[in-house]
């Protein structure tokens, strides 16, 4: 959906491949892999505006990596945002966190708390309640895809 939304606009869509399964405590492997991908992108094509999009642990990794100067914003779908997750690095970033309140894997309440804390740190953060989909986003998948694509395209258009 994102690829279609930005087609013909000179946008590269790339995917982070995790080296390890899971977050792995303080190692935060997924976040490190996202940061490595940003550095690899910079080496390949120079400094360009970046929007990070991630689901669940990928949303957490995207939010952690958002301190990179190239990152314009983040779209996080049903992100895993445990209390105490750092937000200080998010000042000046636009963040969209989408979450279905019936999600039983990750907590919408923790996402909304993250949004409040990110705002206090200077981020332009928005929590978007979704009314369908649960964690896997299977029911209403077209809505989730459309919203992710629209928000990603909007973030790329700003600035």
For the regions a protein language model found, what residue spans apply to each?
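Serine-hydrolase catalytic machinery in alpha/beta-hydrolase-like enzymes
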Residues: 1-47
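Gly/Ala-rich beta-loop-alpha elbow adjacent to hydrolase catalytic centers
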Residues: 53-58, 62
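Active-site nucleophile loop of the alpha/beta-hydrolase fold
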Residues: 76-83
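Short beta-strand/loop motif that positions the catalytic acidic residue
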Residues: 91, 96-103
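Acidic beta-to-alpha connecting loop that harbors the catalytic carboxylate
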Residues: 101-104, 132-134
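Conserved alpha/beta-hydrolase "acid-adjacent" motif
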Residues: 104-113
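C-terminal catalytic histidine-bearing segment of alpha/beta-hydrolase fold enzymes
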Residues: 112, 119-159
